[in-house]
């Protein structure tokens, strides 16, 4: 399958043949597992001190005294039990708890292929909430000169030329303060995802693009399902460079 390659001014440069991965089967179940696997890989096991709440000389006086059979100190205060001050927790976190979603290597690669193919489907991209009216084509491939851009305003001009600015506005207007205690835990704002830019190698465009609302930038070799299907929802609006297409072809 061939698609158009666009210059930075929006004109057509020519055609490029897409790798076969862009025609992979759409498997939302695999995509979900791969994303959850990436998310849970950041977790770490946690537990409590094995003797927490047990360091006390409190003893139980047994039954037949007309009061609860909890262990008591010499002064008669309850201890050791969860409902007592300084007692153990009822159900503390366990190190043995299974936190991670395990996935096979080939299964993970197939999930990425499925997510890449979904990003080229206008129906799936639109259903995810992206504004794609006027976007020349999907997948959207731009000249390799994009990777040499240094200024954020230059990247923004390219986005406007390719009609991606409407989705940037959607992401910018969608930023809101999170409800609940998460505001106190380092995640005050909910920030919608907008365009994903995939480049061939580390370049100036990475720092030039990432300050735009909702925009993420990743190299083709580091691309995974969590980038192109955030929140387990496939169909992210993606901008590819020519070099990125060549690199992706080498991965599959």
Swiss-Prot record:
UniProt keywords, alphabetically: Ribonucleoprotein, Ribosomal protein, RNA-binding, rRNA-binding
GO-annotated molecular function: rRNA binding; structural constituent of ribosome
Annotated Pfam families: Ribosomal_L4
Cleavable signal peptide: none
Gene Ontology terms: biological process: translation
A cellular component term, taken from the record's GO annotations: ribonucleoprotein complex
InterPro entries hit by this protein: Ribosomal_uL4 (IPR002136), Ribosomal_uL4_dom_sf (IPR023574), Ribosomal_uL4_euk/arc_CS (IPR013000), Ribosomal_uL4_euk/arch (IPR045240), Ribosomall_uL4-arc (IPR019970)
Protein origin, superkingdom: Archaea
Homology family: Belongs to the universal ribosomal protein uL4 family.
Known function: One of the primary rRNA binding proteins, this protein initially binds near the 5'-end of the 23S rRNA. It is important during the early stages of 50S assembly. It makes multiple contacts with different domains of the 23S rRNA in the assembled 50S subunit and ribosome.
NCBIfam families (alphabetical): rpl4p_arch (TIGR03672)
Subunit: Part of the 50S ribosomal subunit.
Protein name: Large ribosomal subunit protein uL4
Species in which this protein is naturally found: Methanococcus maripaludis (strain DSM 14266 / JCM 13030 / NBRC 101832 / S2 / LL)
